[in-house]
Amino acid sequence: MGIRIYKPTSAGRRNASVSDFKELTPGYTPERSLLRPKTKTGGRNNQGKITSRHRGGGHKQKYRVIDFRRVKDGVVATVDSVQYDPNRTARIALLKYPDGEKHYVIAPSGVAAGDKLQNGPDAPPVVGNCLPLKNIPLGTSVCCIEMRAGRGAVMCRSAGTQATLQAREADWAQLLLPSGEVRRVPSACRATIGQVGNSDHMNIVLGKAGRSRWLGRRPHVRGTAMNPIDHPHGGGEGRTKGGRHPVSPSGKSAKGGRTRQKRKPSNSSIVRRRKSRRYGQLKLHK
């Protein structure tokens, strides 16, 4: 993909940029059988309480049903088109199987209309194919990785992400993730060969607040600008937060505090934690 930079014809256009969408298939239409209605929540739960701040509004969207499991083995599918998905940063590819079945999958970089893709242990390790980690050569870049066999891909699904298969031992495979974390996953788990497309997404500049609102993002108000009833940093005369370390509205440490569960089952699968810009190499949970 490429990025198109706008001319500074107004304050909102200055420094703004947008994808050129050249990787998309011209003239495609979304597959209606794979579309579902998407209800907006505004960041509220079933009690009407805000559980995710700064959410609300945005353009109306329809959800695209993505095949994250890719268990239709032994059949060669044809990429009908590469399409835009408003629900994620990556592009999606529409696969057509010989029996007429159609599936959406995350489109790796380099996949285009007309390509042939396969799933299963007998598939060749080429970009776009999905196969178990035990059948993938060491050093290969992979994406859309399962953490439990048959549960579907959960890691490396956003634009431009990829992991590297570093080693295999017994029934486990060792992966270097984009964050720098090294993690073990069962070698029976599946992954897609290649890097997720739309890698320049991180370089796009929205340019104005309105484009954030189109995406359903509401303003992020500072705690020091609030009243004491609304935030621990609120109130006071002038710009002061009462001598307190930065915290969230609920009082949790906002800069570097651990929020991960200490006894989370997947902690045992982490070989090396990521490197933090602030604290350097992080230690494993004990």
From Swiss-Prot:
Disulfide bonds: none annotated. It holds the Pfam family Ribosomal_L2. SUPFAM superfamilies: Nucleic acid-binding proteins, Translation proteins SH3-like domain. Keywords: Ribonucleoprotein, Ribosomal protein, RNA-binding, rRNA-binding. Residues 255-286 have a biased composition (Basic residues). GO terms for cellular component: large ribosomal subunit. Residues 22-59, 215-286 are annotated as: Disordered. Residues 230-240 have a biased composition (Basic and acidic residues). GO terms for molecular function: RNA binding; rRNA binding; structural constituent of ribosome; transferase activity. GO terms for biological process: cytoplasmic translation. NCBIfam families: rplB_bact. One of the primary rRNA binding proteins. Required for association of the 30S and 50S subunits to form the 70S ribosome, for tRNA binding and peptide bond formation. It has been suggested to have peptidyltransferase activity; this is somewhat controversial. Makes several contacts with the 16S rRNA in the 70S ribosome. Part of the 50S ribosomal subunit. Forms a bridge to the 30S subunit in the 70S ribosome. Belongs to the universal ribosomal protein uL2 family. This is Large ribosomal subunit protein uL2. It comes from Rhodopirellula baltica (strain DSM 10527 / NCIMB 13988 / SH1).
